[in-house]
Amino acid sequence: MWPTLRYVGGVCGLARYCVAGGFLRASGPASGVPGLLCGGGRRSSSTSSFDIVIVGGGIVGLASARTLILKHPGLSIGVVEKEKDLALHQTGHNSGVIHSGIYYKPESLKAKLCVEGAALIYEYCNLKGIPYRQCGKLIVAVEQEEIPRLQALYERGLQNGVEGLRLIQQEDIKKKEPYCRGLMAIDCPYTGIVNYQQVALSFAQDFQEAGGSILRDFEVKGIEIAKENSSRSKDGMNYPIAVKNSKGKEIRCRYVVTCAGLYSDRISELSGCNPDPQIVPFRGDYLVLKPEKGYLVKGNIYPVPDSRFPFLGVHFTPRLDGTIWLGPNAVLAFKREGYRPFDFDARDVMEVILKSGFINLVFQHFSYGVNEMYKACFLSETVKHLQKFIPEITISDVLRGPAGVRAQALDRDGNLVEDFVFDGGTGEIADRVLHVRNAPSPAATSSLAISRMIAEEAQQRFKL
């Protein structure tokens, strides 16, 4: 069972579950369904009918598909992904950190699943030979007024069961990060780095080898009760849900699990469920330290976070390829997949303004938003922040790097939804659907733990 049930009224009488508080490339498309990746699947007699369809080919969707098929090898399970490749968006545009679980409210889903998920990710990478580096992390207080918050964060980490935490002083900071200045820090030795896209593609390989099927280039535009015709009457009885794509194709299934990331609210609404909480896309821009300055950073270096926001602040992150990423900031993206500053989609912007509580959020945190926009526009402002930790960095040492877009759930009052949110519902369709509604960081770290929870709930809810 999912830990705590909270009922939220909606179109389908929604029941929301939350705690109170290298690369393997799949084979090309097969005939029949667009973008079908054959995996020796245990499909029904129709190649487009499945017991369970999972919407979303990111790391959470693929982990969930893998866990479900390993737990229920007799079921036919398919994953649908709107892109031509897997794990392209949030999974492929993050800093690659294996988080320890220190930041999250005790007893929350994030706290529980991150600690559990980190252990599972390390175990999985060891099993599969996927490269990672357990390089650790320092959370550094550079001002006296940050020390009480740092100490409180340390206590929170202990409550969450994070391994190996210790508070260290200036001399020990220098031993771990010779070029970093700070008054006090939390040493998190369990933090690591990995390529999550590679992990996700390995999940996909496991899923296909176990008999699952992946349908790429299948953008879901409808989740409906299947309409009967004489040729498919048997399918209609056994597979009552029709999942339709933007090209007019459909697949039939008994149950649906959605892991739609940036589109989780829209996919929920397609199934007749409550679109709240709404997704607001935040773009994060990274800088890259020039290679000749890579010696300045050994492991992850993070600031003491501001508890008012779910963002962890501009930080230093080593990558497996030897580069050092600096950032990200957090600014509103004017498109759900808007990786460039001037990417724009009118529908996405109007939904943020009219449907979410974004305007309230702006009024509540106006100065923070202005500061983030300023840092996005002026490189020198971000560098000034970085110099608080490593004074030797200059503006000539950094280059503009990649960007990612974070799907952040926001309620109607303008409050950022802090915890993971998973929805079920009641109704002809909603009884057969489970939604992953809010799964920002640390969802990649937590992906295997999340998948276990989804599999357990699917077994009980769908009586598998």
From Swiss-Prot:
Reaction(s) the record says it catalyses: (S)-2-hydroxyglutarate + A = 2-oxoglutarate + AH2
Q: Does the keyword Acetylation apply?
A: yes
Which GO molecular function annotation, any one, does this entry have? 2-hydroxyglutarate dehydrogenase activity
One Pfam family here: DAO
Q: What superkingdom heads the lineage? A: Eukaryota
Q: Where in the cell is it found?
A: Mitochondrion
Tell me which residues bear N6-acetyllysine: K105, K174
Q: Listed GO cellular component terms?
A: membrane; mitochondrion
Q: Which UniProt keywords apply?
A: Acetylation, FAD, Flavoprotein, Mitochondrion, Oxidoreductase, Transit peptide
Listed cofactors: FAD
Presequence positions on this chain: 1-52
Write the Enzyme Commission number(s) for this entry: 1.1.99.2
| Family of the protein in this entry | Belongs to the L2HGDH family.
Stated name of the protein: L-2-hydroxyglutarate dehydrogenase, mitochondrial
Task: State the species of origin.
Answer: Mus musculus (Mouse)
